[in-house]
C-alpha cells in the first residue's frame, strides 16, 4: 500500500489515549487501525497539578505501542494532540519531551477552544441529521460544548470537568449513593451555568454526544432493546440502577462493559447536569469527534451539506450499483409514500431511511445474484456508513434483507431505529417499488394509485394492465401472498 495515502491522528486524552490510522481513497476515508488504551492520565494529577511519575510511565508505555505503527506513515500526515490534563500539568513539558522522542514527531498541546472546534469538525463530517447542532464531548478532565451550523461553529466552550476528575472528586469513596450523585450534578451545573445562556441563544435542532459516556449509554440501550435516543428519563433510570448497586466495584448494568464501568457514574452525573441545565430533549451518538476532526483537517475535505448522500454515493461507486435503477426505485417509493403519508403518518427521518434503502438495495448483486438480499444486508451491517447511527444501519440492513421473498417479521421487530409498525410500513413500500420498477425503464412503470386504511393497502393499476402483463400479474400475486402471510392485507385492482 502506498504510504502517502495513510494518515494518523493521536489524541492524548485525560482518560484514554487513542490512535486512528486511515487511508484516503477517492475523497472518502477508510479506517485501517483504531487503538485505544485506558491510561487515566488525569488520575495522576495531584492538588498542585503535578503529574505523577506512574501516570507518565503509563502514558509513555502506551505511546511505545503507537510508535511502531507510525513508522510507515510520512510525518506531515501525522497529528498528535494533547488535551486537558497536559494543559493543566505543571510538569507537562517533561512528559511531552519524552513522548516526542518515543513517537518521533511533534506533540501539540491544544487549547480547550481548539479541542472543541476539532470535535465539532469530526462530528460535522460523520454525523447525519439537521445542520444546526449542539455537540457534547465529556472527556476525562474537560467537557466540550459546541454549537454550529454545517461546518461553521457558532459558540465553543471547554469546561473544567470530566469523568476522571469528577470520579476522584465526588466518588472517591467508590460509593454510589444519592448524595454523591447530587453533589456531582450540582457541581457540574455550577460549571455549566455561566455558558448556558450563550449556548441556548445559538440554539440547535439536533444534539449529538461524542464521548465514552455517550458510547457506553448507546451500548446499554442497544443491549436492552431500547431505541437509541438518549433522554433525561433514561439517564435518571440508569442513575437509580447505579444507586441500587451501591458500590462502584459492584456496578452491573446490562450492556455496560467492565472497562467503561469505572468512569460511568461520574460521566452520567455530568450528562444529567447538561441535559437539565440546557433543557436537552434527546441526544444521539456522533459518528466521530476529535480524531476524525484531525484527519479531515489534514485532508482538507469540505463538510458535505448532506453526509448521508456522500456515503450513499461512495458505496454505490464501490459496489458498481446501477444508479439509474436505484433512483427509479427511490422515486417510486417516494411517490407511494406521498400517497399513504396521511394515513400512516411517516416521519421525515423514516422517509429518508426508506430512500436510502432504495439507493442501496442492489449492492448484494456485487457478490452474487443468488441470495442478493442477504448479501446486501450483510454489507450494510458491516460497512462504515458516516451519517447513519448504529440503529439506522440495522434498520437499513433489515429492510434490504426483506426486499423480496417471504418476509422475516421478527427481524423488522428487532431493529430499534423506528417503531416495529413503521418498519413494516417502510418494508411494504420498498418491496412494491422494487417490484414495479423491475423492468428498469421509466416508460414501463405503470401509473399506480395506492391507498391505505390502517394496515390495509389498496393498489389500483390502469384498467387492462394486468391482462397485458402476465409475468407482472404473477409477480404481484406472489407478493400479495407473501404480504398476507404476515397479515399485511394487499388488495390489487
Swiss-Prot record:
InterPro entries: ATPase_NBD, GppA/Ppx_hydrolase, Guo-5TP_3DP_PyrP, Ppx_GppA_C, Ppx_GppA_N, PyroPPase_GppA_Ppx
EC number: 3.6.1.40
Keywords of this entry: Hydrolase
Annotated GO biological process: guanosine pentaphosphate catabolic process; guanosine tetraphosphate biosynthetic process; nucleobase-containing small molecule interconversion
CDD domains (UniProt xref): ASKHA_NBD_EcGppA-like
Record carries keyword Manganese: no
Name of the protein this chain belongs to: Guanosine-5'-triphosphate,3'-diphosphate pyrophosphatase
This protein's pathway: Purine metabolism; ppGpp biosynthesis; ppGpp from GTP: step 2/2
Similarity comment text for this entry: Belongs to the GppA/Ppx family. GppA subfamily.
Coiled-coil zones: none
Amino acid at each position: 500500500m502506498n504510504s502517502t495515502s495513510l494518515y494518523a491522528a493521536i489524541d492524548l486524552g485525560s482518560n484514554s489515549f487513542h490512535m486512528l490510522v486511515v487511508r484516503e481513497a477517492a475523497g472518502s476515508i477508510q479506517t485501517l487501525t483504531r487503538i485505544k488504551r485506558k491510561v487515566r492520565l488525569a488520575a495522576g494529577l495531584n492538588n498542585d497539578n503535578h503529574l505523577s511519575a506512574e501516570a507518565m510511565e503509563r502514558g509513555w508505555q502506551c505511546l511505545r505501542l503507537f510508535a511502531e505503527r507510525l513508522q510507515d506513515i510520512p510525518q506531515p500526515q501525522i497529528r498528535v494532540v494533547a488535551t486537558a490534563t497536559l494543559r493543566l500539568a505543571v510538569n507537562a513539558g517533561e512528559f511531552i519531551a519524552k513522548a516526542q522522542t518515543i513517537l518521533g514527531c511533534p506533540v501539540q498541546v491544544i487549547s480547550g477552544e481548539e479541542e472543541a472546534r476539532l470535535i465539532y469538525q469530526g462530528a460535522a463530517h460523520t454525523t447525519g441529521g439537521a445542520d444546526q447542532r449542539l455537540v457534547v464531548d465529556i472527556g476525562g478532565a474537560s467537557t466540550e460544548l459546541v454549537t454550529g451550523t454545517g461546518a461553521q461553529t457558532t459558540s465553543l466552550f471547554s469546561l473544567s470537568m470530566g469523568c476522571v476528575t469528577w470520579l476522584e472528586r465526588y466518588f472517591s469513596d467508590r460509593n454510589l449513593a444519592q448524595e454523591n450523585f447530587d453533589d456531582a450534578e450540582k457541581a457540574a451545573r455550577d460549571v455549566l451555568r455561566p455558558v448556558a445562556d450563550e449556548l441556548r441563544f445559538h440554539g440547535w435542532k439536533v444534539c449529538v454526544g461524542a464521548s465514552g459516556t455517550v458510547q457506553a449509554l448507546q451500548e446499554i440501550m442497544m443491549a436492552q432493546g431500547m431505541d437509541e435516543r438518549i433522554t433525561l428519563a433514561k439517564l435518571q433510570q440508569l442513575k437509580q440502577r447505579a444507586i441500587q448497586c451501591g458500590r462502584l466495584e459492584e456496578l452491573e448494568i446490562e450492556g455496560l462493559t467492565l472497562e467503561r464501568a469505572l468512569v460511568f457514574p461520574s460521566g452520567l452525573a455530568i450528562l444529567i447536569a447538561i441535559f437539565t441545565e440546557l433543557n436537552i430533549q434527546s441526544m444521539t451518538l456522533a459518528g466521530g469527534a476529535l480524531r476524525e476532526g484531525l484527519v479531515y483537517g489534514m485532508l482538507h475535505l469540505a463538510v458535505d451539506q448532506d453526509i448521508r448522500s456522500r456515503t450513499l454515493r461512495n458505496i454505490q461507486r464501490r459496489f458498481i450499483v446501477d444508479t439509474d435503477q436505484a433512483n427509479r426505485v427511490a422515486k417510486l417509493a417516494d411517490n407511494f409514500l406521498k400517497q399513504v403519508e396521511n394515513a400512516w403518518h411517516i416521519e421525515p427521518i423514516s422517509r429518508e431511511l426508506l430512500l436510502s434503502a432504495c439507493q442501496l438495495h442492489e449492492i448484494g448483486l456485487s457478490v452474487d445474484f443468488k441470495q442478493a438480499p442477504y448479501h446486501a444486508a450483510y454489507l450494510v451491517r458491516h460497512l462504515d456508513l458516516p451519517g447513519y447511527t448504529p440503529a439506522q444501519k440495522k434498520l437499513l440492513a433489515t429492510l434490504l434483507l426483506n426486499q423480496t421473498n417471504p418476509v422475516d417479521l421478527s427481524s423488522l421487530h428487532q431493529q430499534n431505529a423506528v417503531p416495529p409498525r413503521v418498519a413494516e410500513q417502510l418494508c411494504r413500500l420498498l418491496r412494491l417499488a422494487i417490484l414495479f420498477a423491475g423492468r428498469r425503464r421509466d416508460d414501463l412503470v405503470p401509473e399506480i394509485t395506492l391507498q391505505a386504511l390502517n394496515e390495509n393497502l389498496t393498489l389500483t393499476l390502469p384498467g387492462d394492465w394486468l391482462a397485458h402483463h402476465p409475468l407482472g400479474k404473477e409477480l404481484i400475486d406472489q407478493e400479495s401472498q407473501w404480504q398476507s402471510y404476515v397479515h399485511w392485507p394487499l388488495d390489487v385492482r
